[in-house]
Amino acid sequence: MTQPAVLQPLKTWSHLAARRRKPSEYEIVSTNLHYSTDRPDAPFELDPNMPMALWFKQNRNASPLKHADWNGFRDPDEIIYRTYNMLQDGHENYVYGLFDQFSARGHDAMLDHGWARHLARLYAPGRYLFHALQMGSAYLCQIAPASTISNCGTYQTADTLRWLTHTAYRTRELSNSFDDLGFGAGERDKWENDPAWQGFRELVEKALVAYDWGESFVALNLVARPAVEEAVLRALGQAGRHNGDTLLGLLTDAQLADADRHRRWTGALVKFALQTEGNDKVLADWLAKWAPLGDAAIDAYCAHLPDSPGAAQAAKDGCAELRRSYGL
């Protein structure tokens, strides 16, 4: 009589066994974590017709951006929660060291009043812009089809919160030296009404309602964030250096270091998606829709930057070259 076979237990992390090597810390804590993808017909393994399930089925599962195995994506930097905190603790110490050193030197008191007026208009309202980018990254984290993508969105969200808090901190400092320029009081009005910001406001507000996960990724990481980085960080930082604001230049350089990491995982995800036939057209169609909004936002903002001839074209060229480097 044949004896029933004894089932052997699966090895720990059996989903990574195909690689035939001990999985890395990154792979162990980052891969295949989305339980909401186990049953595509019923995300979260609850009523398939409840609003949240319908939302994920429409905006994630039915996205025209397809791949047979999104869980195969890997962050090229292999960032995990532990290493992210180690990395950014050092970066925050650097930034707040800048704040302390320049404050001790009386940096703000030495700024030209005319330049401070530009900061009140073109820098301080940026916290509204950064908050919109933060919300967009948080949505991408929630809606992405793989945990390795969601993790990248999570760290990007946290980085953008850093930018926002840096801006808020500097706004408060500048209000101490220039109490007649409305620092800390007039930013919302400028964000909602100043011509310099209306292109970016249109871009990010529309991006926040691009609910398909793939289109959200394109609008945010391929258009909005590069436009902000090239104009509101790089070009403004260069204008600051031209006007004796060394602190602003160093601060934007530190923020652009975060942006470089975002760009690496963005490029890796684009190249991963392009492995699937048809995704090139999907991405191209979305870029045709969103890239003009990004260029218009750059033009509107850079038109008001002082001492910055050619800033708008340089920023647009930077965005276009970035997308070309991804194969788009």
What function would you assign to each model-found segment?
Residues M1-L129, L274-L328:
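Terminal targeting/low-complexity segments that flank the catalytic cores of oxidoreductases
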Residues D41-D47, H113-A144, Y211-A239:
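Alpha-helical bundle segments that constitute or directly flank the non-heme di-iron/ferroxidase center
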Residues I79, T165, K206:
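His/Met- and acidic-residue-enriched segments that coordinate or traffic transition-metal cofactors
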Residues F102-L122, G182-L222:
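Acidic/His metal-coordination segments adjacent to aromatic residues that form catalytic metal sites
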Residues H113-W191:
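Long, hydrophobic, well-ordered secondary-structure blocks that form the structural core
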Residues G126-L129, Q156, N221-R225, L251, ...:
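Amphipathic alpha-helix face/heptad-repeat signature
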Residues A138-C152, R170-D179, A207-S216, R234-A254, ...:
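Inter-helical turn/loop segments and adjacent helix faces that build the functional surface
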Residues Y155-E173, A227, A254-L269, L293-A296:
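Alpha-helical scaffold segments in carbohydrate-active enzymes
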